[in-house]
Amino acid sequence: MQTLNYLVIILIIAGVISVLAFTPLVRKLKIRFYLIQVLAIVLFVYVFFGRQIIYLFPDVYGQNSQSSQNLDSLRLSRIFLLDLCPFFAVIAPVFVFLKQKKISGVLAVFGLFGALVTLFGELIFTPVNEQDIVNFIFVGTGNNQIYFMMHFLSLLVSLAIILWDNCFSLISFFYIHVFALIYFSYVALMVSVFKGQITGNTTGILASDWTNGEYKNVATFLNLSNSDPQLVFIVGFSLSYVAILLMTLFANIPTFMEMKKDKIFIKKENLIRKDLELLA
């Protein structure tokens, strides 16, 4: 790992600490929902105009000059949001503005997990030199437009939603399964519709995903053979499932605390009622 990679790690940790540090203050403010919405707008605008629009209007941005199967596959993945992190960055900000907060909470769990895996499973290990550090952080390189900043902002927005908003309850455990079923079914359907045209960037649906990028590094970390993508797929998805459940459990801690307070309150009420009955 190079010296500049540690700078990237410091930036990530500083962002996380900032969200955590402001959490007690923000939760006391009536405008906390607006603060989340501002962060969500920044994420959406950055990703849409810095990344999505290039694939929606490739002729305007000169992206059709060198057409290839890999590039065509990437376009389809980008346009239809078949990768979880771009999906979160574009779709989650929309749900932040809805009165029903449960959906944004569920998306935040997946967004947080995806951002952490990519940031710490791939990006902090990407070789960076002094000439490219600014582009790496703010612009991206090659076809990985704003790759770091998209995941960094997704990390901050996800944390803000989870910590600042009261959008979780016990039913969230049910909702994360519903979302996973719908989203992965959607990705599998699009892969089937564009059979042979989409070769990767499908949130792990295709085996090629598990031999590249953060998946490859995670497989190396878990000491799994990249020559056996099925094993990487099974272990990776299993660990991902457990991690998402634990994140949902963590997000529900305030709910559990409220339930405990309610039980104590009800118990006190019952004791008072019994005392009054004895006095009567």
UniProtKB/Swiss-Prot annotation:
Which residues span the membrane?
A: 6-26, 38-58, 79-99, 105-125, 144-164, 171-191, 231-251
Q: Can you supply one Gene Ontology CC term for this chain's record?
A: plasma membrane
Keywords annotated in UniProt: Cell membrane, Membrane, Transmembrane, Transmembrane helix
Which compartment or compartments is the protein found in? Answer: Cell membrane
InterPro entries, alphabetized: DUF5378
- Chief subcellular location equals membrane
| One Pfam family it belongs to | DUF5378
**Presence of keyword Transmembrane:** yes
Topology term for the membrane: Multi-pass membrane protein
Q: List the disulfide bonds.
A: none
Q: What is this protein called?
A: Uncharacterized protein MG135
Which source organism?
A: Mycoplasma genitalium (strain ATCC 33530 / DSM 19775 / NCTC 10195 / G37) (Mycoplasmoides genitalium)
Lineage runs: Bacteria, Bacillati, Mycoplasmatota, Mycoplasmoidales, Mycoplasmoidaceae
